[in-house]
């Protein structure tokens, strides 16, 4: 179901008021294993549409793009290091085991608002977007779109999450609100960096009502996935699942009871993922474990185990809509009652509320080389040029697995316009489009929604 989450939300989340995003193929071009993107629109988005610019950055699928190089390498979130001294080893670096990202979405004291990132955003940003920027979130079409390396470095430093849909901040608690006003496609936030093994903890309240789905997902650009899904009519239950390289095997889903109502009470939902096993945890208690050894496919002679760099995504989306497949509607508990749902009547939208997110990256096979390169970098570069690592792929006979995963310290991670790509990072704007800024939809003002 999580693949459907992304398609439902993000194929249409920006296309409002008859606006067609100039970075998406027009007319629409779908990408799949059977049909890769054309040279003119080379990047296959996570949601199955060909395009350029933003679609080449976050979630760009190298499997179905024109070529793997069409996708920009993705910045990595690495394990935190600490300096250790001992009598036998001397002074050395060691992984601290501390989170590399912790946020309660409060304003950052060091925030530097960037009024304009690129040419298409010539009209600046809204007051809401400025507030979200100061809390470490940036609108999806604007992330890493700039012709200025200095601005790109500031974005990497400032922004923890990319957002789309109806995002706002609770005026009392300052928790982040994922909103879904009447007959819309909901909201999504995605971590701006990826990690290859790690632990993520999300403290949140889910939305409620038949047809309403809240989800916490680890998602890789090659479609490995680990998730939690919450059906809004089953507030004492959570579903867990995983997928390997986009293979839609729904037999792996499991249901688990929750200690209390997921809409009324905050719970901490965690995924603890390493090279050999996955733990799903609720409020510190393990509810499910998957071992890599149990995912062996004797036919293809591979482990069907998630093992590519993941971003963390948290979303709210409508499964119970008249145009959804009947099986999806039944799974979601029926159709959404857009007119009489209590939260629609009281607050103007359905909503999930996120209080805190923490991500702790783990060790992986690349870390020894990365740490060695880090030491060499520090000896040759100034503090103004921080050490950055990004992941990218080369094809392995159509399969994208750790054997073809590459890491870079010198990759260009930004594009100069909405029409640039990983192969042509400084491409100018297409002549058939006029410059304009993408409309940002303001969420209704919400205070103390839950």
UniProtKB/Swiss-Prot annotation:
Q: Which family does it belong to?
A: Belongs to the glycosyl hydrolase 16 family. CRR1 subfamily.
Give GO terms for biological process. Answer: ascospore wall assembly; carbohydrate metabolic process; chitin metabolic process; fungal-type cell wall organization
Annotated InterPro entries: ConA-like_dom_sf (IPR013320), GH16 (IPR000757), Glycosyl_Hydrlase_16 (IPR050546)
What name does this protein carry? Probable glycosidase CRR1
Q: Cite the EC number.
A: 3.2.-.-
> What is the originating organism of this protein?
Eremothecium gossypii (strain ATCC 10895 / CBS 109.51 / FGSC 9923 / NRRL Y-1056)
Q: Where is this region: Disordered?
A: 428-450
GO terms assigned for molecular function? glycosyltransferase activity; hydrolase activity, hydrolyzing O-glycosyl compounds
């Amino acid at each position: 179901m999580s693949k459907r989450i992304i398609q439902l939300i993000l194929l249409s989340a920006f296309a409002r008021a008859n606006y067609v995003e100039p970075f998406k193929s027009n007319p629409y071009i779908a990408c799949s294993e059977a049909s890769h993107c054309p040279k003119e629109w080379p990047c296959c988005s996570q949601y199955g549409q060909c395009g350029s610019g933003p679609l080449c950055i976050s979630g760009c699928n190298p499997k179905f793009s024109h070529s793997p190089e069409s996708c920009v390498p993705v910045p990595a979130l690495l394990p935190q290091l600490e300096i250790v001294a001992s009598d036998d080893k001397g002074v050395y670096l060691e992984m601290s085991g501390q989170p590399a990202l912790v946020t309660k979405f409060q304003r950052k004291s060091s925030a530097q608002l960037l009024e304009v990132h690129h040419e298409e955003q010539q009209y600046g940003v809204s007051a809401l977007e400025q507030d979200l920027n100061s809390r470490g979130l940036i609108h999806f079409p604007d992330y890493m779109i700039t012709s200025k390396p200095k601005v790109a470095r500031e974005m990497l430093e400032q922004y923890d999450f990319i957002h789309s849909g109806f995002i706002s901040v609770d005026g009392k608690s300052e928790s982040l609100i994922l909103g879904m006003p009447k007959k819309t496609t909901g909201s999504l936030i995605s971590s701006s960096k990826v990690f290859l093994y790690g632990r993520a903890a999300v403290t949140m309240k889910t939305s409620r009502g038949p047809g309403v789905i809240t989800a916490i997902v680890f998602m890789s650009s090659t479609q490995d996935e680990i998730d939690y899904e919450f059906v809004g009519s089953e507030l004492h239950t959570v579903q867990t699942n995983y997928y390997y390289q986009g293979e839609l095997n729904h037999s792996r889903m499991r249901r688990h009871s929750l200690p209390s109502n997921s809409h009324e009470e905050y719970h901490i939902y965690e995924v603890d993922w390493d090279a050999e096993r996955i733990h799903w945890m609720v409020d510190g208690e393990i509810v499910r474990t998957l071992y890599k050894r149990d995912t062996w496919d004797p036919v293809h002679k591979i482990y069907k185990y998630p093992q590519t760099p993941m971003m963390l995504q948290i979303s709210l989306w409508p499964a119970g809509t008249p145009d959804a497949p009947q099986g999806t509607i039944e799974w979601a508990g029926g159709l959404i009652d857009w007119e009489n749902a209590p939260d629609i009547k009281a607050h103007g939208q359905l909503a999930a509320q996120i209080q805190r997110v923490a991500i702790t990256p783990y060790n992986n096979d690349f870390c020894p080389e990365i740490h060695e390169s880090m030491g060499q970098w520090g000896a040759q570069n100034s503090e103004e040029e921080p050490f950055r690592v990004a992941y990218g792929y080369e094809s392995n006979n159509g399969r994208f697995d750790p054997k073809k995963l590459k890491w870079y310290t010198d990759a260009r991670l930004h594009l100069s316009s909405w029409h640039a790509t990983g192969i042509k990072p400084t491409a100018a704007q297409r002549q058939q489009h006029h410059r304009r800024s993408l409309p940002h939809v303001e969420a209704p003002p919400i205070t103390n929604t839950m």
